[in-house]
Structures are given as C-alpha cells and as structure tokens.
C-alpha cells in the first residue's frame, strides 16, 4: 500500500485492489493521471466545498474511464458546487457507507464539511479535511466567554470555544476508534504560534502508525516538519514530504 502526495491536502492512496484520491485541488506535476490509467476501481473523496479541497475537474475523470465512485461531503451540494447526480455518495457528519471494499465514516470538522475515516484491506486511514484547532495562537490571551477580533479572519472569534469544539470532535472520533495506521492532518504555519497544537492534541489521544502533514502549501514544506519534534517524542513515524509526487510505503 502506498501514499502519494499530490498538493496541499491532496493525496492518492493505492492499495492492492483500489485507488483512493483525497481532496484534489491542483496537480501541478501531473501526479494523478497515471493512477487513473490503472485497472483498479477509483474512489474520490472531497471533505468540503472550499476550493482548496474540492475541484469540479474531478468529474472530468469520468470521461477518461469507468469505475470511479465519488464520495463527497454534503456541504458541497449545499453550497451548489456540484449537482446531486455528480456524486455516487453524499455524506454528512455521522454518516457511514460501505461497498464491501471500503468502509467509510464521515466525522466532524471545526470548519466546513467532514473528516474521513476509511478502512480498507486491513488499514485504518484518517484524513482530517479542515478539522483543526485553527485559533490556537489566540489562546494565551483568551478569556472564557469573551471574543477576540481577528484582522486575518475579519471577525470576532472565541478561541476557547473553538478549542472545546475541536476536542469534542476528537472525542466523537474516539467513539469509533482510538488508533489509525495513517493520519493526514493540517500543519499550517499560517496559523502562527501554536500551529502544531491541533496535531499534538490528536496524537495525545490516538495511536498513530504514520503522521502525514498537509495544508502547508502557503508556508512551505519545512514548516510542516516542525511537527516531527512532537511525533518523535511519542515514537510516531513522520513523513517529511519534500515535493509533489513523493510516495511512501505504508
């Protein structure tokens, strides 16, 4: 089983029997086309409607081949980014789906859409989508019940409530499992101080076979490697991605 980095939060997981594509946005190095030519069923996941996690170009792949199953978050349809007939499966938080090859759980997010648990061929995979403790840098100055104005987000935010929501989502995930063979999770330096906090809180609560950073394209590959210090403390393997198209054995 291999995992290939496409771009941003996009990955291709190839198993013995199938190919899974997560959160395709851009493919600057032509990583995906060779996978579409393989004689295996393809499953395409999009966690939410944001343009950096969903690109309607994925539907063009149907013209190239048969055997593609589209598994999309319902918020994509709600925000009119796709028609109901575009996807084979629409899922919201709490929904599940299986075809005997894949077993899929749609979990919550602290932003839009869902995060994914996928079980296939004896492996349990987690793709976080936009689930994260996004306002971590505001926590040191936060007071319970009070909001802080963020120029970046142009809104009043409540970092303590947001963190509580995030930890609540992790608690919901633990009701299903406490371990993953692979975790793909946002390590985004744009958050500022504390940008690894969400990842650290996750590995404190779950056994992780391999931690894979994502959502770091704006701050660079090396910014994501900051998380390795914390995975090393727990003897969790960390994938130091260095380029698009890079592949790791799972």
Task: Give the ranges of each region predicted by the language model.
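Active-site HxH/HxHxD metal-binding segment of metal-dependent hydrolases
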Residues: 33-97
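Binuclear metal-ion centers of metallo-dependent hydrolases, dominated by the metallo-beta-lactamase
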Residues: 4-8, 81-97, 174, 191, ...
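Short hydrophobic/aromatic beta-strand or adjacent loop that forms the aromatic wall/cage
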Residues: 8-10, 112-115
